[in-house]
């Protein structure tokens, strides 16, 4: 998950608050110290951290929660609102024909981001073309060409031409049928006069609709000064922060860049070409705190091609204990695409579930591998066995294991976990709070933020 360490610590703090018998001055002080430690570890500026926690303490001790809201939930609401202040305003990514120019230093992920951007717009129904205008970095042309092929985007480049302006103008003509044209420009090891002059010359000649600066999240707070320097020199319309999944400093990078008052358009959340998302401060913070991001959850379900009717049917079967192996197989098959399960888990309101634990990337990978093995096992079952797992005896287990090329123990483990899941659902059936969460996920999409008064 993006900012896994930060998220895990913040979710633990949320659980500490919601698990408190009451909120008094000592509790507020303790939570304040926890937040300071967590945010400083994430490389957020010291003064920013002090300002956040000071205001959080003041509000927690002076303000009274609305009628019907518990002090614990109101405390979470205050933390949410104070953290939201340092993440900037929502971006306005327009889904229309446009020309986008990417700028930034070497190694920050411009070329990969160009591919992810093209993939993003193509998923939204717009055709995309990539233009290789990095004339300095070795193999930049070949890398972007390979990326374009991997996402089925159009491509233009001229490895023999050393004038980026000529390349781009020719590229815009060749790719005139592409609705979104993305220009990958050269970088430098540091911001120098040559880089600034080249970017200015391209911008003046091409007049792109958007100039997006690509920043590496591993820079932490230092992302702020660098972003400001490039923005002051050439003027940018938005920012892409990359590698948010691989650093503990992402929180510092986000808060530092947000101070520029230039919107953060996208964040890179993984290695796959699908791992780029529009940066929405409210959605991002909700996921970070474990309050859920139901909009992303439903987008993920949509990506898996699960209809609302199918989701509702699965929910009803789960809650009535009628869920069988065939139903389980159908769901797993839809979420088998790489990265989709991770995206789903990150969107769930786990901090609201009593006794829930943080699910890390290694656990998700292990689960994906296990589910793949279980799908192979179920492929060796008859329709009757999938519909009625109770009939699977020792003889059938032996046959299924041989057909799937696995151990009999693996088949037994699948049946054991399926039975445990059904039993857990029966227990949860009487838990109205848990049922409310599940129903919200399948139906309304309003749980989490609405329940805390955050929307």
From Swiss-Prot:
Key word Calcium present: no
Catalytic reaction(s) noted: GTP + H2O = GDP + phosphate + H(+)
UniProt: GTP binding residues: 104-111, 184-188, 242-245
InterPro entries on file: P-loop_NTPase, Signal_recog_part_SRP54_M_sf, Signal_recog_particl_SRP54_hlx, Signal_recog_particle_SRP54_M, SRP/SRP_N, SRP54, SRP54_GTPase_dom, SRP54_N_sf
Main subcellular location: cytoplasm
Subcellular compartments: Cytoplasm
GO terms of molecular function: 7S RNA binding; GTP binding; GTPase activity
Record-level GO BP terms: SRP-dependent cotranslational protein targeting to membrane
Subunit structure: Part of the signal recognition particle protein translocation system, which is composed of SRP and FtsY. Archaeal SRP consists of a 7S RNA molecule of 300 nucleotides and two protein subunits: SRP54 and SRP19.
Domain notes: Composed of three domains: the N-terminal N domain, which is responsible for interactions with the ribosome, the central G domain, which binds GTP, and the C-terminal M domain, which binds the RNA and the signal sequence of the RNC.
HAMAP family named in the record: SRP54
Function: Involved in targeting and insertion of nascent membrane proteins into the cytoplasmic membrane. Binds to the hydrophobic signal sequence of the ribosome-nascent chain (RNC) as it emerges from the ribosomes. The SRP-RNC complex is then targeted to the cytoplasmic membrane where it interacts with the SRP receptor FtsY.
Record-given protein name: Signal recognition particle 54 kDa protein
Gene encoding the protein: srp54
């Amino acid at each position: 998950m993006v900012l896994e360490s930060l998220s895990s610590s913040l979710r633990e703090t949320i659980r500490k608050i919601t698990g408190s018998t009451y909120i008094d001055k000592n509790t507020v002080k303790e939570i304040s110290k926890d937040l300071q430690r967590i945010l400083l570890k994430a490389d957020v500026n010291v003064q920013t951290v002090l300002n956040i926690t000071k205001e959080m303490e003041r509000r927690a001790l002076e303000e009274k929660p609305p009628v019907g809201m518990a002090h614990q939930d109101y405390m979470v609401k205050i933390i949410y609102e104070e953290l939201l202040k340092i993440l900037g305003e929502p971006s306005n990514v327009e889904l229309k024909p446009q020309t986008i120019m990417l700028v930034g230093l070497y190694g920050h992920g411009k070329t990969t981001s160009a591919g992810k951007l093209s993939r993003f717009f193509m998923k939204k129904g717009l055709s995309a073309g990539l233009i290789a205008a990095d004339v300095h970095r070795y193999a930049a042309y070949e890398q972007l060409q390979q990326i374009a092929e991997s996402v089925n985007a159009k491509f233009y480049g001229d490895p023999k031409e050393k004038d980026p302006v000529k390349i781009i103008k020719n590229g815009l003509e060749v790719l005139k049928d592409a609705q979104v044209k993305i220009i990958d420009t050269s970088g430098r090891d540091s911001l120098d006069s040559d880089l600034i002059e080249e970017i200015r010359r391209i911008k003046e000649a091409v007049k792109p609709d958007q100039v997006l600066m690509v920043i590496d999240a591993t820079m932490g707070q230092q992302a702020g000064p660098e972003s400001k320097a490039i923005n002051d020199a050439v003027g940018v319309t938005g920012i892409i922060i990359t590698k948010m999944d691989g650093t503990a400093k992402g929180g510092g990078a986000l808060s530092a860049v947000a101070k520029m008052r230039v919107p953060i358009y996208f964040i890179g959340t993984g290695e796959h070409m699908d791992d780029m998302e529009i940066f929405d401060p409210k959605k991002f913070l909700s996921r970070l705190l474990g309050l859920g991001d139901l909009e992303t959850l439903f987008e993920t379900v949509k990506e898996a091609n699960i209809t609302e009717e199918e989701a509702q049917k699965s929910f009803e079967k789960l809650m009535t204990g009628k869920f069988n192996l065939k139903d389980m197989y159908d769901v797993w098959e839809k979420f088998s695409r790489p990265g989709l399960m991770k995206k789903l888990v990150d969107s769930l309101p786990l901090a609201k579930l009593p006794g829930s634990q943080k699910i890390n990337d290694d656990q998700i990978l292990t689960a994906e591998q296990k589910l793949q093995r279980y799908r192979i096992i179920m492929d060796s079952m008859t329709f009757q066995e999938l519909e009625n797992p109770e009939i699977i005896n020792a003889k059938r287990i032996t046959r299924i294991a041989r057909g799937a090329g696995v151990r009999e123990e693996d088949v037994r483990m699948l049946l054991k976990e399926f039975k445990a899941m059904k039993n857990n659902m029966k227990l949860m059936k009487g838990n109205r709070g848990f049922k409310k969460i599940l129903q919200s996920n399948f139906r309304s999409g309003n749980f989490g933020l609405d329940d805390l008064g955050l929307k």
